[in-house]
From Swiss-Prot:
Lineage: Archaea, Thermoproteota, Thermoprotei, Thermoproteales, Thermoproteaceae
A Pfam family matched in the record: Ribosomal_S13
GO molecular function ontology, one term from the record: rRNA binding
Protein name: Small ribosomal subunit protein uS13
Similarity-based family: Belongs to the universal ribosomal protein uS13 family.
Amino acid sequence: MSQEIRAIVRIGDTDLDGNKQVAYSLTKIRGIGIATAYAICRKLGIDPHAILGALSEEQINKLDWAVRNLHELAPAWFLNRRKDPETGKDLHLIGAELVLAAKRDVDLMKKLKSWKGVRHSLGLKVRGQRTVTTGRLGPVAGVTKKKAAAGGK
């Protein structure tokens, strides 16, 4: 009895490779790392080393639900957005939501003119790194050689 393997599986609004193991396929979703992928598999009782495309439709639906609702399965310290400034809830954002939330956070810092916001708006380093020799922007100035001196003695 041969089992058909789907080449592409859609989970969390992302197309995943169905020929890879479940845990490693889940890491292709932005916001899901390897530790999170293994935790999801462990919570759902799915073998993380099974081939994703070989899973049943029910198991794939369970995975999709778990990826979207990780805040219900995992403790607060495991989530990527704790105490959201707008709602005050612990969330785990994935995909485009994660990118937009980070952009909104930076825009809010710029609007409030906090130290980090000012650094972001000036395009400088934000986390206290040195800026004298590293992180230089723009074209390289380069060095020009002087013309060789005319014949010697």
